[in-house]
């Protein structure tokens, strides 16, 4: 189980990312349209003005039940060992164990 402070920090980053998403997207579109180098540098400066934690690269997908940041499956939103336990307990419909 991840510490609650780490989970809260991740939620705060998600809120910041949503807040500044439109600003980042619009300035990136401007960069592709502008041809002069000096104008591009000004727009790059605008991109650096939002807080660092608002960047989408700083977000991690976390397990829905444990908050574990590694080995997550996007389809289920669970980490690998929790997914395995739930499949063994037949709690996930349609998921089957592999056998060969």
Swiss-Prot record:
SUPFAM superfamilies: Glucocorticoid receptor-like (DNA-binding domain). Binds 16S rRNA, required for the assembly of 30S particles. It holds the Pfam family Ribosomal_S14. Keywords: Chloroplast, Plastid, Ribonucleoprotein, Ribosomal protein, RNA-binding, rRNA-binding. Coiled coil: none annotated. HAMAP family: Ribosomal_uS14_1. GO terms for molecular function: rRNA binding; structural constituent of ribosome. InterPro entries: Ribosomal_uS14, Ribosomal_uS14_bac/plastid, Ribosomal_uS14_CS. This is Small ribosomal subunit protein uS14c. Gene3D superfamilies: 1.10.287.1480. GO terms for cellular component: chloroplast; small ribosomal subunit. One of its GO terms (biological process) is translation. Part of the 30S ribosomal subunit. Belongs to the universal ribosomal protein uS14 family. Residues 1-23 are annotated as: Disordered. The gene is rps14. It is found in: Plastid, Chloroplast.
